[in-house]
């Protein structure tokens, strides 16, 4: 028990969360609203399932310098003469195939440069696009130096945001007066991009690079480099700017599917609708998975095989995600056993969360259940010790479980070790506690060494519409708590924020991608913060942000899914987080939360691949100089994303074996 170390914002000691971060909005609907939504959905008809497409692995391949999924995250490309990967990641000699998923830019331009209409000169890619049909004379003016204007500011993205490859081009958003046209200039060691865009109204200037150009930009920014972005605008013949930001690019593409619950979604049926949707990298809209009948409060297994969810006010169930569309029922329960379940990584069983009694009026104890039969699984060391284990989560390797230890007086995050062969739990350890609020939603990093979790000002965090939330990490071995100030939107270690005035303290319900990608861990969480000018928060009587708790189709900042990079092996005392970015493809009017990013099903031997983690064998290589395919374990060391048992198996010095895959930490910027 760590009652003397309640969570704090100032200093690394753990004290009560300051009042300035203790009043705002949680990411969850009120009990009355959610119960009404569930009841309305139940009365509307039988439980529905969406016509979702089958999970796709999107195998990409590239030859030479860092094909990286051919620009869109799921394509192919060829070109260049150097291996597409960092030192030790060559897979086929000087002219062999490079990884189509995560290779660094090699000698020569990445193929995505020419796909975007760019030109290669040596290793430098030069791209010019003019989607705004800006006149040549105006282009010349925009390239000149303008005057400073404090109102002309970046609203989104945030400075120093780390972007992975394979996602949609972000929507750049700016404050200030109206604009007739904008000029975006992005440079790196091997990139020179120029884009000219149409203007916008005051406070609502938005623009996006073409998807091909964004893919080329992401591919051209290598390890240790950044995309240096400058934006200039012109209005009435007067040029303003430039204003600048820098964006590091992770040397890898995220892949798989994000499953999340939604309220008020058009895809799910409109106002007062509920359901579970999914987004895949590069998709512009979500796809229905399960809609109506109260299908919310879900969890998805890390391997993408299993979904667990509430069905109605009194039932819950487990479902297979391996079909060629929609879901297939596996097991049902007449209580909340599968509601917010902590699923084992392979989805075959899970730990029931403590009952959400205010919504479901159940008294479900935290117990292990099979997702295939619904039967209770006896769990030695747990059944005799834990009754109330809230929001449980297994580590990616399945050897640990973290949960809210609600059997104790204070809300506490605890963890236990787990032996899957005997279904035995042991070694109960309290990791962090909050004396006057809530700590909840623990999620392990892929290496199992750290737990990311949410703090909240209210003990009824799951349904309280006047709750704050910030995210912290705790070291499993030392129980050292660290703030994630940068992710949460704070500047330094104070309470000042780089977000709009209403937005601090609105971050909830984190999960983690189960593998390291591009040298980082990746957190997915719900936030009620503003999304630039496209979705602004409003102030309540306390001057803090308010959620749309009663009107899912209003214009206030509903919960949205955001994503942020977390450093691997950050030094003690250092915030490991980076600024978050909005997960594109969501519906702006919907209230979205609890995103689970799961991996696609692995591919069998001989199937094309981009990296080892796409293969059931764990290895992706070129055979006889041909295309990359899944192969049996070769002799020698393991490349990035290939199988390993220890870090000594990894080819490159400094690479780590994380969740049985070799991972390369990011180079110094």
What is each residue range found by the language model?
Residues 4-6, 445:
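Intrinsically disordered, low-complexity Ser/Thr/Pro-rich tracts
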């Amino acid at each position: 028990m760590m009652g003397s170390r309640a969570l704090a914002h100032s200093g690394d000691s753990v004290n009560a969360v300051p009042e300035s971060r203790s009043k705002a909005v949680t990411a969850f609907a009120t009990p009355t609203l959610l119960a009404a939504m569930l009841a309305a959905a139940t009365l509307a008809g039988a439980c529905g399932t969406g016509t979702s497409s089958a999970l796709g692995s999107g195998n990409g391949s590239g030859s030479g310098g860092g094909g990286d999924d051919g620009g869109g995250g799921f394509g192919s490309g060829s070109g260049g003469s150097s291996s597409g990967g960092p030192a030790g990641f060559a897979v086929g000699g000087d002219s062999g195939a490079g990884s189509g998923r995560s290779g660094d830019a090699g000698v020569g331009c990445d193929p995505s440069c020419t796909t975007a209409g760019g030109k290669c000169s040596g290793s430098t890619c030069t791209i010019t696009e003019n989607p705004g049909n800006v006149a040549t004379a105006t282009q010349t003016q925009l390239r000149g130096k303008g005057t400073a204007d404090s109102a002309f500011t970046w609203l989104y993205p945030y400075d120093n945001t780390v972007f992975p490859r394979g996602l949609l081009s972000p929507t750049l958003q700016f404050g200030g007066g109206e604009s007739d046209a904008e000029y975006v200039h992005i440079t790196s060691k091997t990139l020179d991009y120029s884009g000219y865009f149409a203007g916008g109204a005051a406070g609502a200037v938005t623009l996006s690079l073409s998807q091909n150009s964004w893919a080329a930009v992401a591919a051209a920014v290598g390890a240790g480099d950044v995309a240096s972005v400058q934006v200039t605008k012109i209005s009435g013949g007067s040029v303003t700017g430039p204003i600048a930001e820098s964006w590091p690019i992770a040397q890898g593409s995220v892949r798989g599917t994000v499953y999340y619950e939604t309220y008020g979604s058009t895809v799910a049926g409109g106002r007062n609708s509920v359901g579970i949707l999914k987004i895949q990298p590069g998709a512009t809209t979500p796809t229905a998975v399960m809609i109506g009948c109260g299908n919310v409060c879900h969890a998805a297994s890390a391997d993408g095989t299993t979904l667990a969810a509430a069905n109605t006010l009194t039932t819950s169930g487990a479902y297979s995600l391996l079909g060629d569309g929609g879901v297939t029922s596996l097991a049902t329960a007449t209580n909340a056993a599968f509601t917010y379940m902590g699923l084992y990584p392979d989805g075959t069983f899970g730990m029931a969360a403590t009952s959400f009694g205010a919504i479901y009026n159940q008294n479900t104890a935290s117990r292990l259940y099979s997702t295939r039969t619904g039967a209770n699984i006896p769990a030695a060391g747990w059944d005799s010790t834990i009754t109330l284990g809230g929001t449980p989560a297994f580590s990616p390797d399945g050897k640990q479980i973290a949960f809210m230890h609600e059997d104790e007086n204070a809300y506490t995050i605890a963890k236990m070790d787990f032996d899957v062969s005997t279904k035995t739990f042991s070694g109960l350890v309290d990791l962090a506690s909050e004396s006057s609020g809530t700590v909840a939603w623990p999620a392990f990093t892929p290496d199992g060494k750290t737990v990311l979790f949410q703090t909240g000002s209210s003990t009824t965090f799951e349904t309280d519409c006047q709750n704050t939330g910030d995210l912290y990490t705790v070291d499993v071995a030392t129980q050292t708590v660290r703030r994630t100030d940068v992710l949460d939107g704070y500047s330094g270690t104070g309470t000042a924020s780089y977000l709009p005035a209403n937005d601090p303290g609105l971050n909830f319900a984190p999960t983690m991608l189960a593998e390291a990608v591009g040298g980082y861990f990746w957190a997915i969480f719900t936030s009620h913060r503003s999304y630039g000018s496209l979705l602004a928060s409003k102030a309540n009587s306390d001057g803090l942000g308010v959620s749309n708790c009663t009107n899912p189709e209003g214009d206030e900042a509903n919960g949205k899914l955001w994503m942020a990079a977390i450093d691997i092996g950050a030094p003690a005392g250092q915030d490991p987080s980076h600024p978050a970015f909005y997960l594109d493809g969501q519906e702006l009017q919907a209230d979205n939360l609890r995103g689970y990013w799961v991996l696609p099903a692995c591919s069998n031997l001989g199937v094309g691949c981009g990296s080892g983690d796409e293969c059931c064998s764990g290895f992706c290589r070129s055979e006889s100089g041909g295309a990359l395919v899944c192969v049996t374990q070769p002799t020698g060391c393991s490349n990035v994303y290939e199988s390993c048992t220890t870090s000594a198996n990894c080819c490159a010095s400094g690479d780590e074996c994380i969740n049985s895959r070799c991972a390369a930490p990011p180079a110094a910027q």
